[in-house]
């Protein structure tokens, strides 16, 4: 877990003097859809003993209806451990968002499997699903091993595993071969595998369409071919998903998704969504998809809920969706933005 500092009113970071701070992580952002809709969610993470930022993060997770578990490390002095900071503005109009990560001394790099009683979590507590992000898997050699061991233990207990590849070039630099092996094994163990066109190419070596660009709706066949290759490479995985995004302007995107399960394909054709802050939209999609899977909905319904949950997250300043209820999410899918009284 870390924090995000965001300038108010859509201003650039470098010329702002007023900021909002929020607690954030890819995994907790995904879990927020389920926690706000009443499912129990626990976050496994690390804290800094006595840190007011750790207290801020714990209080935020509690406000999201989540529990948490993890070791508390001594800071080790003023140059020691702390929580990472994302310096991220929202962009506005024709000026795109910019993100800089300050990860010096990040306590999350210290995570190890033996800091948790995984048999209790997956056995006695009966966790049905564990979601892993490639951000943590690539953070350090220790966290790579942590994610591997968590996935292996979950598989041994019959717990479903979700893995969002979340490639970040800065974390992979100099560790490409090592991380490719780690990500391959986690993907092999996973029941749900998520990534965009760049993630699948850079993390797993599977060819796909060129990243980004215009005309995303006309590239759907290329995305399906890419997912087809991923399915061949990972035959034990049950669900494969990718999002489709074309940026018209900072505040207007074409947003779509593709989900494949078994022989079935569920394509949410890109359509316009309004965007207040784009960061967390992909996590919102995954969170909505997993909520539908946990509710044992038909896959088409779960995929639609994922699309709408991602669109919801894009309307919020937080990195995560905070649905009031299922009806609010479905109204987004249906394109109904009328006032509800």
Model-derived regions, located:
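Conserved phosphate/ATP/ADP-binding segment of small-molecule kinases
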Residues: 171-263
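Alpha-helix C-terminal capping segments
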Residues: 22, 29-42, 63, 292-295
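Positively charged, low-complexity intrinsically disordered leader regions
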Residues: 1-12
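Conserved post-catalytic alpha-helical subdomain immediately downstream of the catalytic base
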Residues: 250, 266-335, 339
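Charged helix-capping and loop-helix junction motifs
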Residues: 116, 144-149, 175-184
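Short pre-catalytic strand/loop immediately N-terminal to key active-site residues, enriched for Gly-Thr
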Residues: 14-24, 228, 266-280
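Hydrophobic beta-strand scaffold residues
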Residues: 41, 68, 161-163, 194
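Conserved N-terminal subdomain of the carbohydrate kinase-like
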Residues: 41-134, 329-341
